[in-house]
Amino acid sequence: MTESASCHGGGVCGGLAQEEGQRQVFCGLTSIVWLHRKMRDAFFLVVGSRTCAHLLQSAAGVMIFAEPRFATAVLGERDLAGMADCNEELDRVVHELLARRPEIRTLFLVGSCPSEVIKLDLGKAAERLTAAHEGRVRVLPYSGSGLETTFTQGEDQFLTTLAHELPASPEGAPSLIVLGTLADVVEDQFRRLFDQLGIGPVHFLPPRTGADLPPVGPGTRVLQAQPFTGEATRALIRRGAERLDAPYPLGVEGTRSWLQAATRSFGVPDEQLEAVIEAPIARAQAALERQRGVLSGKRITFLPDSQLELPLARFLSEECGMQPVEVATPYFDREFHGRERDALGEEVRLVEGQDVDAQLDRLRADRPDLTVCGLGLANPLEAEGLRTKWSIELVFSPIQGFEQAGDLAELFARPLVRHETLKV
């Protein structure tokens, strides 16, 4: 994050309090769990420790009926002590992997805390391996290290690497890139809406296969679908693209404004947009109405975890009648998150960063009806009588767009309904 994008140090900056201290977050390797499902001809090889391997195996434990598209090249004690040639062993592992999995077209070498501590140059390794397998596979490096990051930034690093690999578009050729991983069903819904609006060509990054990397250039518009794509967006801007300023497509109003940013950029009249989205909005409003009775008036606190906190709080406040007490986010980027912050108003306590002990003290004093937090904090808070929602579930679930608005609201209603059902 650049200095202009965020204030640094403790205190309050532009109405946003900042905290530094002990944190409770997953590292960027966790993003592989959803990225490997998206790019179907890619493979993610983590160069890390046994701890890295255990994290991925635990996070992706549901993948028991299919061979996953990720693995860990484990650095042993001799590697970490500098007593072995890591590059030679890495080459051997990659050669065996490609011989066993001939369908791989793009291989990502994913850096970890251990590989970065011993300064293993995965960039040079990727160049060497690409040359060794020329015409067979493209090898690309990126960092999934947990040093000073949160888990969704793993996707940002991944997308930034892809941004550098995109082909150049013809000078001035108009196109739209939707940036950030979306569930296939959501992607298909958005594509149909863009087709009905006459906007195109539309590309989604990341694509479903490495062969579908979109071109980028001066005529390209970028529409962020996820709030944790800041560095990738800047990389596309450096390639000549233009970012469209919009809220994130959560809920009816977020999705409408998100689509409107695209239609106005492409010269589509507002009347045409409203005609196209009238039916989806009606379905979304009906689905939301079923959840408002549970959510309206309830108080909610977000602990920092995924960077989805601000747009989720905006959706729950505007469309479900919830009252955000404190909304904390791991990183705040004024350029990309400012609209979402402004929508929450002055009465909501906003925090960037984490001092987990201080935040837990405030949480116990506030006693909100629902707390959105990481897995490691959920059970202890439940034991204290606080109802919780796992933040990582909101990253894995299809929540964007009109058709998912009711499902998104239901994700927050479930723990409240469960609590009332189990109350003695």
From Swiss-Prot:
**Entry annotated with the keyword Disulfide bond:** no
Keywords in UniProt for this one? 4Fe-4S, ATP-binding, Bacteriochlorophyll biosynthesis, Chlorophyll biosynthesis, Iron, Iron-sulfur, Metal-binding, Nucleotide-binding, Oxidoreductase, Photosynthesis
Pfam families with a match to the protein in the record: Oxidored_nitro (PF00148)
Q: Which gene encodes it?
A: bchN
Q: How is the cofactor bound?
A: Binds 1 [4Fe-4S] cluster per heterodimer. The cluster is bound at the heterodimer interface by residues from both subunits.
Needed co-factor(s): [4Fe-4S] cluster
What functional role does this protein have?
Component of the dark-operative protochlorophyllide reductase (DPOR) that uses Mg-ATP and reduced ferredoxin to reduce ring D of protochlorophyllide (Pchlide) to form chlorophyllide a (Chlide). This reaction is light-independent. The NB-protein (BchN-BchB) is the catalytic component of the complex.
EC?
1.3.7.7
**Which family is it part of?**
Belongs to the BchN/ChlN family.
Listed under GO biological process in this entry are: light-independent bacteriochlorophyll biosynthetic process; photosynthesis, dark reaction
What does the annotation say about its assembly with partners? Protochlorophyllide reductase is composed of three subunits; BchL, BchN and BchB. Forms a heterotetramer of two BchB and two BchN subunits.
Q: What is this protein called?
A: Light-independent protochlorophyllide reductase subunit N
InterPro entries documented for this protein: LIPOR_BchN/ChlN, Nase/OxRdtase_comp1, Protochl_reductN
GO molecular-function term, one example from the UniProt record: oxidoreductase activity, acting on iron-sulfur proteins as donors
Q: In which pathway does it act?
A: Porphyrin-containing compound metabolism; bacteriochlorophyll biosynthesis (light-independent)
